[in-house]
Amino acid sequence: MKGQVVRIIAGFYDVVDPKNRKLYPLLRGSGLLRLNETSPIVGDFVDFEEKGFIKKIYERKNQLIRPKVANIDQALVFISIREPNFSSLLLDKFLLVIEAKNIPVILLVTKIDLDSNFENLLLDYQKMNYNIFFINNKKNEIPVELKAELEKKLNFVIGQTGVGKTSFINNFLDKKFAIQEISQTLNRGKHTTRVVQIIEKENFRIIDSPGFSSFSYSEISKNEIRNAFKIFKKFSSDCKFRSCFHFQEKTDQCGIKRALKDGKIPENRYKNYLYFLGKYEKKNY
């Protein structure tokens, strides 16, 4: 049988059959997988026995190391305007990793009711053609257009603590109902966010993870950093040298610097890139 890993607890794997959405709890990895030091992660497609072991892990289309998730269709990046205050550096940290993995991104900007200047803070990202939705936490409404974007996809949720991820999941998936159903099936008590897991309702699936503190870009190589951002990939093809890091090179030799000079890349995005590059050089990831 083929299924997808939706949760891992203490070496046991919960697998869902994608055809009928039936849950198969408490599976273990086979001896062959353990011999090869291979372990499934949340999001993996696997072959399994109904009351036994996971026998095979299928090739992943993408993967994050921290948190360990695979086969993401798109990432929902939460960022708040206030409480906590908006930070382009933090937002670009998330985007650096996600775009390096070629994962499509939707930006969900929360707490817009706390600052009337919220749209100006995101102007650079609008100019870079990011898909952005503004969320008013007081209204507790989810745009119909956003629901359409999320349907029939595996959506990875990431964002700083306190930006409204939990409220969104509760509101969007009726989380209490979904988790109660799973808890009764597995007899595991109430849900906590100490584990990465896929929560679903009807045609919507969201990867719930412990929080942004475990989100790491240490897995990205120096070569990936220089062309990680989607907009950098677009203009780096105009660089004279394939090894260009868009830093010490002359403007006429660097496609990124020319795009920056022409206003096609926001100055703040370039400054954040230099910050990440400097962190890499200091090995302080």
Swiss-Prot record:
Gene Ontology, cellular component aspect: cytoplasm
The protein's required cofactors: Zn(2+)
MF term (GO), any: metal ion binding
UniProt-annotated binding residues for GTP: T110, K111, I112, D113, G159, Q160, T161, G162, V163, G164, K165, T166, S167
Main location (coarse class): cytoplasm
SUPFAM superfamilies documented for this protein: Nucleic acid-binding proteins (SSF50249), P-loop containing nucleoside triphosphate hydrolases (SSF52540)
InterPro entries per record: G_CP_dom (IPR030378), NA-bd_OB-fold (IPR012340), P-loop_NTPase (IPR027417), Ribosome_biogen_GTPase_RsgA (IPR004881), RsgA_GTPase_dom (IPR010914), RsgA_N (IPR031944)
Residue ranges occupied by any CP-type G domain in the UniProt entry: 61-215
Gene3D superfamilies reported for this sequence: Nucleic acid-binding proteins (2.40.50.140), P-loop containing nucleotide triphosphate hydrolases (3.40.50.300), Probable gtpase engc, domain 3 (1.10.40.50)
Membrane-traversing stretches: none
EC assignment: 3.6.1.-
Cofactor remark from the record: Binds 1 zinc ion per subunit.
GO biological process: ribosomal small subunit biogenesis
Assigned keywords, A-Z: Cytoplasm, GTP-binding, Hydrolase, Metal-binding, Nucleotide-binding, Ribosome biogenesis, RNA-binding, rRNA-binding, Zinc
CDD domains: YjeQ_EngC (cd01854)
Cellular compartments annotated: Cytoplasm
Binding site for Zn(2+): C239, C244, H246, C254
Keyword set includes Manganese: no
UniProt cross-references to HAMAP family, sorted A to Z: GTPase_RsgA
Assembly, per entry: Monomer. Associates with 30S ribosomal subunit, binds 16S rRNA.
General function of this protein: One of several proteins that assist in the late maturation steps of the functional core of the 30S ribosomal subunit. Helps release RbfA from mature subunits. May play a role in the assembly of ribosomal proteins into the subunit. Circularly permuted GTPase that catalyzes slow GTP hydrolysis, GTPase activity is stimulated by the 30S ribosomal subunit.
Family indicated by similarity: Belongs to the TRAFAC class YlqF/YawG GTPase family. RsgA subfamily.
Protein name per its UniProtKB record: Small ribosomal subunit biogenesis GTPase RsgA
